[in-house]
């Protein structure tokens, strides 16, 4: 095991004793907010300490087995114990590395997914529709619930813009690396010469706001408009002005919702999206400052970051951040995203481990 890992694990063992002491204090027990916070940390540290205790035990077993190799009568059994211990030690070290990685507080939250057509006109809008279908199908595979909060359908199909709310377990943590520019290369149905056209969409994945960290909104800095909700083809969903658009005047950030029939409900959801966009703006500004100090493997998640190319003639999808190419484009577009998302997750873990090692 690397020395920096052993040092980190020793600190966890020490911290466990400190937490045991804190949880026994009457003043801590009387403050339920503080008690729950310490109890959560205690559960996390206990898991790490327990696995590290197992690692130390198997390390001792390995040492004892090596001493028995010199005994002809025990050599075969000793070698079996050595092989078994080494295999488990490798597994435990990998597990401990993952447990030591910093937790992303928003990973467990629901998410808003915003897809916008970019360069490429009608073809870009059609591709926005393809991406919407891809994420919707992936959500169905995961048992997540998808709600369309707002949509601006294009005349020839697809969307100029669409905002989804996805509700489920670890939604943001799973989809957060989808933020950025998505480029498509294919022959449009209207192309008579068979030429490949390139167009693009942008995707923004934002965690549903945590009420405890909500940004204070001054009502005087909000403009709230109501309008009649309409779907694709201009068909009115209802005949009342139930759709709501909220503009944050200081930043110009806009959020709208037209999904529900209730103006009150649409306003509440639009304000949620606005909160998410304001928090995302703050996150992006922090990421830009951090990027000046180091270049992250996964990228900042900015819309300007071109993260992926979908090449239809070659049937391939390439993620430029981790230089991964998969020749299973149709399966991925049908919602089988796990091979790509898992590779991105592993890349992020490797990046975090390097940061941990650097201290």
Curated annotation (Swiss-Prot):
GO terms for cellular component: cytoplasm. Keywords: Cytoplasm, Methylation, Protein biosynthesis. SUPFAM superfamilies: Release factor (SSF75620). Methylated by PrmC. Methylation increases the termination efficiency of RF1. Signal peptide: none annotated. One of its GO terms (molecular function) is translation release factor activity, codon specific. The modification N5-methylglutamine is found at residue 235. It is found in: Cytoplasm. InterPro entries: PCRF, Pep_chain_release_fac_I, Pep_chain_release_fac_I_sf, Prokaryotic/Mito_RF, RF-1. HAMAP family: Rel_fac_1. Belongs to the prokaryotic/mitochondrial release factor family. Peptide chain release factor 1 directs the termination of translation in response to the peptide chain termination codons UAG and UAA. This is Peptide chain release factor 1. It comes from Verminephrobacter eiseniae (strain EF01-2).
């Amino acid at each position: 095991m690397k020395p920096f890992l052993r040092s980190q694990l020793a600190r966890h063992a020490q911290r466990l004793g400190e937490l045991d002491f804190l949880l026994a204090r009457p003043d801590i027990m009387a403050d339920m907010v503080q008690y729950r916070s310490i109890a959560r940390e205690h559960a996390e540290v206990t898991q790490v300490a327990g696995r590290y205790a197992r690692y130390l035990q198997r390390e001792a077993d390995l040492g004892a087995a090596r001493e028995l190799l010199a005994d002809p009568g025990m050599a075969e059994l000793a070698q079996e114990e050595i092989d078994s211990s080494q295999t488990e030690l490798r597994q435990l070290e990998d597990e401990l590395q993952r447990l030591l990685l910093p937790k992303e507080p928003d990973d467990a939250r629901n998410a808003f997914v915003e897809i916008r057509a970019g360069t490429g006109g009608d073809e870009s809008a059609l591709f926005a529709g393809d991406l919407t279908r891809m994420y919707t199908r992936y959500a169905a595979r995961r048992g997540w619930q998808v709600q369309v909060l707002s949509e601006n359908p294009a005349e020839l199909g697809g969307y100029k813009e669409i905002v989804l709310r996805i509700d489920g377990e670890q939604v943001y943590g799973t989809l957060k690396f989808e933020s950025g520019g998505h480029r498509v290369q294919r022959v449009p149905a209207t192309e008579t010469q068979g030429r490949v056209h390139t167009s693009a969409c942008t995707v923004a994945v934002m965690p549903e706001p945590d009420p405890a960290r909500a940004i204070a909104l001054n009502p005087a800095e909000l403009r709230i408009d109501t309008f009649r909700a309409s779907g694709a083809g201009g068909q009115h969903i209802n005949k009342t002005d139930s759709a709501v658009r909220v503009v944050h005047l200081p930043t110009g950030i806009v959020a709208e919702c037209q999904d529900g029939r209730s103006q009150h409900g649409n306003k509440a959801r639009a304000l949620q999206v606005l909160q998410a966009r304001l928090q995302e703006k703050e996150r992006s500004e922090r990421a830009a400052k951090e990027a000046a100090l180091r270049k992250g493997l996964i990228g900042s998640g900015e819309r300007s970051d071109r993260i992926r190319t979908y090449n239809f003639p070659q049937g391939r999808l390439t993620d430029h951040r981790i230089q991964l190419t998969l020749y299973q484009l149709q399966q991925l577009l049908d919602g089988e995203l796990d091979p790509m998302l898992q590779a991105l997750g592993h890349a992020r873990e490797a990046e975090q481990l390097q940061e941990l090692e650097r201290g």
